[in-house]
Structures are given as C-alpha cells and as structure tokens.
Curated annotation (Swiss-Prot):
CC annotations in GO: cytoplasm
Protein residues bound to ATP: T152, S153, N294, A295, Y296, G297, P298, T299, D385, Y397, G398, G399, R400, K499
Principal cellular location given in the protein's record: cytoplasm
Organism, as annotated: Streptococcus pyogenes serotype M6 (strain ATCC BAA-946 / MGAS10394)
Keyword list, A-Z: ATP-binding, Cytoplasm, Ligase, Nucleotide-binding
Entry-linked PROSITE patterns: AMP_BINDING (PS00455)
Alphabetical list of InterPro entries matching this protein: AA_adenyl_dom, AMP-bd_C, AMP-bd_C_sf, AMP-binding_CS, AMP-dep_synth/lig_dom, ANL_N_sf, DltA, DltA-like
Gene responsible for this protein: dltA
Keyword Cytoplasm attributed: yes
EC number: 6.2.1.54
Protein family per UniProt: Belongs to the ATP-dependent AMP-binding enzyme family. DltA subfamily.
GO annotation terms (biological process): lipoteichoic acid biosynthetic process
Protein name: D-alanine--D-alanyl carrier protein ligase
Annotated catalysed reactions: holo-[D-alanyl-carrier protein] + D-alanine + ATP = D-alanyl-[D-alanyl-carrier protein] + AMP + diphosphate
Length: 512
C-alpha cells in the first residue's frame, strides 16, 4: 500500500536510479534524474516565497518538464493546476480568474499577459535544474492538502476546479494497483496519451510512478497528425493502453493497431466515456489475448469509482457493457429524485461516497453545495449519471441525466439512441442529437453517422443508406427513438480529452 506518492518516487530514485520514468520517442529520463530535477525546481519555487499551500498553474503539453514540475510543486507544498497547451485563451483566463494562482509556470510559451501574477518560463525551470540544488522535504503536500486541481468544462460554460487531495489520490492509486481487474504489473510500461489537464491522465501516471514503471509520451506535434501518430504508437513497447474508447476507435483505423504488430500490448484501460459493445468487439478481434478493463467515475471522485474486466460473453450478451464493481472503500448507491436509496435492479442517479470524493470546487461554494453532500455519514457526490446495481453489486450505466430529453411525449436518453445505432453492422460510430424549436422544445432527433469502410460504395444515394441502417436496427429500437435525419461524416469531432464532442454537434444542428 502506498502511503505517500513522493516517498514512492524517492524510493525508486534510490533502488532503480537508472530506470526510465519517462520516454518520448527514445528520449529518456530516469528516476534518478526526476529526483534531482524535482528537488532543484522545488528549491527554486521555495525561493519565490509564495503563499503557503497556494495553487500554481502549470501550462504545457505531454513533456518531462511538466512531470518534473508537478513533482516539485508537491514537494514544495503546492497543488498544481494543469492547463493544456491547446486550451483556448478564454478558458485560460476563466481558470485564472477562478483559481487565483500564486504563480504561473509556462513550460510552453504562454499566450496571455496576466497582470499581478508572476510567470516562470521554461528557461528559468531549465536554469533551476542545472543548479542541482539539494532539497529537504519539510512541507510537502499531505493528507487533505490539495494535490492537484483539474478544471472541468462546466455545464454553463464556466469551468469548475475539482480539488483532489493527497488522501483522495491515495484512495484511487492503492485501489488501482491492488485490484484484480486492473492487474497492473510491476514496472508497468504505460502509454501516456490523455493530456495532464484531463483526469484520465492520473490513471496512467499514478500507478506507473507508484510501481516504478515507464511513461511513454508523444510529442504534441505528432498528436495532430493521426496517420503518423498511430504509426508511431504501433512501434512503442507499451504494455498498457489508457485512453477514452473514442481514441481507441481512431487507433483501429490503422491496420498496424493489432496484436501481431504490438505483441507487448496486453492491457486496455478505458474511462472518460462509455465503452460500447462494438468497440470492445473490434478490440477483441484485433487483440485476442488482451485484457479490456472498463472503468467508470467522475473527476469529482478521483478518476474512477468502479472497474470490471470485459469478457467476450459480456460483448455477446449485453446491449450496454457493465461499468464495474465499486471500489471497496467507496460505497456507491442508486437514489431516486427524493434522495431515497433504491434497491438492486432499480434505476436512478448514481452517487458515490467515501475517501475518494473531492472536497468540492475551488472558490465555488454555490456549485459545491449543489453537487456535494453527506450520505450515511460519508462525504458524497451527485454524479448526474443514471444507473443501477445488480444483486452481484455490478454497476450498470444508463446515461446522463442532463442528456435526457422529452420528445413526442417520451423521455429519451440520447446515449441510448446512439448505442442502438452503433449496433448496426454498417455503422462505425453514431451520435444522436436534438434539434430545438423557438420554444426550446425538441423538434426532432438527428443522427451523425460515420459508416464502416466500403459501406457508402454499396449505395447510390444516402437516402438508400439511411433506409438500410434503419432497417438493420428496427428490431431492437423503438420507433419513437429513431432519428428523422441522418448526417454522414468521415469522422466525428473530439474534445481535447479525446471524447466525442456532443456539445459541438448539438450547437451545430441548432445554429448556435
């Protein structure tokens, strides 16, 4: 069991100083280097005499210097706020306004001029590393101190800073490295794809650093070139793949993404969005011997609260795959609209309790009070997700409360419509979105469709293709759920975190 994240890293700096902690296309950094560099950066940060425990914004991409800076800030007693280099300036400004960081560390060139907050550049970080300053840890992040603060998008467009403490992080990390579903090996070789500003990244760096493994990162200029990206990934000796299912779907566009070309890849960890039956089935075809682990959880409950190994039997028998057994230390309940606990098999809102639940949103007491509460004497969080628990305590997902719509008198779950369309043998990916009238009522349903290779060529007109897709799903899809219009695309937009960008599609059909 891990009791302190930094203690674990320091231990590996002693026992395996020359073992790589970070690898970017063969450019490696070792555990010994990480200790020396983070010590020097921590000493430099202390010299700035920042307000104790004040948060620090760190701007950059998937680089070693980001990782070293995070470790240094933890040593010096400051929570870090990771902000990705691709973030819009308006979002960065909103985060700064809410978080009021005592310092900005710009590992990449910072796009804004901010009055009243000191900015440290990469050259200053490099100079600090060259100084090789020794460091004695006397005030590092501990217990309920914030370890990191990740900003989510927020339904109103105003970002919310989720505060994750050291104790929260330990609850997640110890579960992940000890749980049989994940089956994390010693010295794991992990693909580091999701950006640090997305809490799915914690699923790769926390167990890797806790078990003395290696993070395989990709340069930011490669991420935009999908063909080159997946050609490169196929050449990496990664054993564990952590991403959203959408990113894996993109990877499967490359013929090289298969067990024959990537024999070292034995584990897939998915979180961040729903893993569909079709994606899991395709993965089993590409990687017959691999383990596929489906995890679920909101950022507010520290990355994930449940996980389960997906089997071929599940793929054959479930319409929507189960999302796991809840963590032993995080009792998970299903409640109705009145907050009453529901029995096994009954569908309601998923709430999570226990030591992984965040203390709330940074400097946002109103939103904190809406989402966080106490249930059965434990800190609890309203996930806003619909679900149920089986008698065997397996969590089943039913969609988002805020993606439910009322149409033609029926209450419809948009994700359910998408799932049904994805069952078509002609469909590679599908998303259902509502079109609203002037009274803000749903006028009709539309579907964005990416068809499988070779499908379009079989039809002279899109109308014929649409009829064929509808016919292929009509036996298991209620007629009132069927979208009235199908829009065909070569690909669907993704958020910077690798999820299908449903909000952008909704705005597109409603001309927002």
């Amino acid at each position: 069991m891990i009791k302190d994240m930094i203690d674990s890293i320091e231990q590996f700096a002693q026992t395996q100083a020359d073992f790589p902690v970070y690898d970017c296309l063969g450019e490696r950094r070792t555990y010994g280097q990480l200790k020396r560099d983070s010590d020097s950066i921590a000493a430099f940060i202390d010299s700035l005499a920042l307000l104790a425990k004040s948060p620090v914004l760190v701007f950059g991409a998937q680089t070693y210097d980001m990782l070293a800076t995070f470790v240094a800030l933890t040593k010096s007693g400051h929570a870090y706020i990771p902000v990705d280099v691709h973030s819009a300036p308006e979002r960065i400004l909103a985060i700064i306004e809410i978080a009021k960081p005592s310092l900005i560390i710009a590992i990449e060139e910072f796009p804004l001029t901010i009055e009243g907050i000191s900015l440290v550049s990469l050259s200053e970080i490099e100079s600090a590393k060259l100084a090789e300053m020794p460091y004695e840890r006397t005030h590092s992040v501990k217990g309920d101190d914030n370890y990191y603060i990740i900003f989510t998008s927020g339904t109103t467009g105003q970002p919310k800073g989720v505060q994750i403490s050291h104790d929260n992080l330990l609850s997640f990390t110890n579960w992940m490295i000890e749980d049989a579903a994940f089956d994390v090996p010693k010295q794991p070789q992990m693909l580091a794809q999701p950006p640090y500003s997305f809490d799915l990244s914690v699923m790769y760096w926390a167990p890797t650093l806790a078990l003395g493994g290696t993070l395989f990162a990709l340069p930011k200029e490669l991420v935009a070139d999908f063909k080159q990206l997946f050609t490169t990934i196929a050449q990496l000796p990664v054993g564990i793949w952590t991403s959203t299912p959408s990113f894996a779907d993109m990877a499967m566009l490359s013929d090289d993404f298969c067990q024959a070309k990537m024999p070292a890849l034995t584990h897939f960890y998915f979180d961040g969005e729903e893993l569909t039956v079709s994606t899991a089935r395709k993965l089993f075809e590409r990687f017959p011997s691999a383990k596929i682990i489906n995890a679920y959880g909101p950022t507010e409950a520290t990355v994930a609260l449940s996980a389960i190994e997906i089997t071929r039997e599940m793929v054959d028998n479930y319409t929507r795959l189960p999302i796991g057994y809840p963590k032993p230390d995080s009792p998970t309940y299903i409640i109705d609209e009145d907050g009453k606990e529901l029995s096994s098999g009954e569908q309601g809102e998923i709430i999570v309790t226990g030591p992984a639940v965040s203390k709330g949103y940074l400097n946002n007491p109103e939103k904190t009070a809406e989402a966080f509460f106490t249930f059965k004497g434990q800190p609890a969080y309203h996930t806003g997700d619909i679900g149920s628990l089986t008698e065997d305590n397996i969590l089943l997902y039913g969609g988002r409360l805020d993606f439910q719509i009322k149409y033609a008198g029926y209450r419809i779950e948009l994700e359910d419509v998408s799932q049904q369309l994805n069952q078509s043998p002609m469909v590679a990916s599908a998303v259902a979105v509502p079109r609203y009238n002037k009274e803000h009522k749903v006028q009709n349903l539309l579907a964005y469709i990416v068809v499988k290779d070779g499908v379009k060529e079989r039809f002279d007109r899109e109308l014929e293709l649409t009829k064929a897709i509808k016919a292929s799903v009509k036996d298991h899809m209620m007629s009132y759920m069927m979208p009235s219009k199908f829009l065909y695309r070569d690909s669907l937009p993704l958020t910077p975190n690798g999820k299908i960008d449903i909000k952008t599609l909704i705005n597109e059909v409603n001309n927002r």
